[in-house]
Amino acid sequence: TCVLISSGLHAQTTQGSMTLGGNFGYSSSKSEGFYGVYTSSSFQVSPKAGYFIMDNLEVGLGFGISTGKSGPDGSEPTKTNSFSAGPYARYYKFTSNDRFAFTGALGFSFGSGKSSTGNSENKTGSMGISIAPGFVYFLTERWGLDFQLNGIGFSSYDPNKDVDNNNQKEFTFNISSLSPTLGFRYYISK
């Protein structure tokens, strides 16, 4: 009976299976400095759909929707909204515990958004590549709890897309800042 249960758990990641799910994240901070109290908050949702092209290798399409607000207390806050989309590939490496697998993901994203303070509004554009380690814990044969760190990434960001050709490029390494995302996935076996 144990063999049937463990082999059933690996069925979610076999060639021809699919997955639906996503991650979500929220951050909030408040700091006091020379110019007073500064507050910041953001929320993001990232739905994904994937297909296993071979055992333990998923490819799919992900979307990102985020909103945020920041600024000094007593002043008009800066509000941001953005949308991104792009393909990803994710590999699953199961441990001796058949309910637990380490994951490594490679993703590409293309996005746009806007930033506004009072009556002033700027359109933004971005493009990025990321490598993200994580793990999935299978709660049942169909549901997995997904945890991912924002790993190594390269992004190109244009903070004022509608006015000039000013581009900022940055290399980010986020493991030390521990920017985790948490989500659920539903696995559909073939």
Summary of predicted features, one role per range:
Residues 30-32, 115-118, 164-168:
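Extracytoplasmic loops and strand-loop junctions of Gram-negative outer membrane beta-barrel proteins
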Residues 34-38:
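Short, polar loop/linker segments at the starts of domains and inter-domain junctions
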Residues 168-178:
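Individual transmembrane alpha-helices with interfacial aromatic-anchor signatures
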Residues 149-150:
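Internal, hydrophobic beta-strand segments that form the core of beta-sheet-rich folds
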Residues 1-16, 189-190:
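Cleavable N-terminal export/targeting peptides
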Residues 18, 24-28, 43, 48-129, ...:
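Gram-negative (and chloroplast) outer-membrane scaffold detector with strong preference
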